[in-house]
UniProtKB/Swiss-Prot annotation:
SUPFAM superfamilies: GroES-like. The keyword Chaperone applies. Keywords: Chaperone, Cytoplasm, Stress response. Together with the chaperonin GroEL, plays an essential role in assisting protein folding. The GroEL-GroES system forms a nano-cage that allows encapsulation of the non-native substrate proteins and provides a physical environment optimized to promote and accelerate protein folding. GroES binds to the apical surface of the GroEL ring, thereby capping the opening of the GroEL channel. Its main location: cytoplasm. Heptamer of 7 subunits arranged in a ring. Interacts with the chaperonin GroEL. This is Co-chaperonin GroES 1. The lineage of its organism: Bacteria, Pseudomonadati, Pseudomonadota, Alphaproteobacteria, Hyphomicrobiales. Signal peptide: none annotated. GO terms for biological process: chaperone cofactor-dependent protein refolding. The keyword Cytoplasm applies. GO terms for molecular function: ATP binding; metal ion binding; protein folding chaperone; protein-folding chaperone binding; unfolded protein binding.
Length: 98
């Protein structure tokens, strides 16, 4: 996993999408224009956490290296060090795989 020098703030995470399959199980090659963006990714970096009502920082439940599922429209696409990544809030994450 390549490290990034970008540190998200608060309850945000930086996610690298997992590459989708180039072929179907039947062997049909899927062109880039027909591929759906995967809704699965690996967390690259995490923020320090959100603050609760008393001002205490609540750490995130996820960590760098976790493989996650997220919503189709979750996050903001950014390019960091030439790599396409997503920045999203922890609340946009549906769950951790594995």
């Amino acid at each position: 996993m390549a490290s990034t020098n970008f540190r998200p703030l608060h309850d945000r995470v930086v996610v690298r999408r997992v590459e989708s399959e180039e072929k179907t199980k039947g062997g049909i090659i899927i062109p880039d224009t027909a591929k759906e963006k995967p809704q699965e990714g690996e967390i690259v970096a995490v923020g320090s956490g959100a603050r609760d009502e008393s001002g205490k920082v609540v750490p995130l439940d996820v960590k760098a290296g976790d493989r996650i599922l997220f919503g189709k429209w979750s996050g903001t696409e950014v390019k960091i060090n030439g790599e396409d990544l997503l920045i999203m809030k922890e609340a946009d994450i549906m769950g951790v795989i594995g």
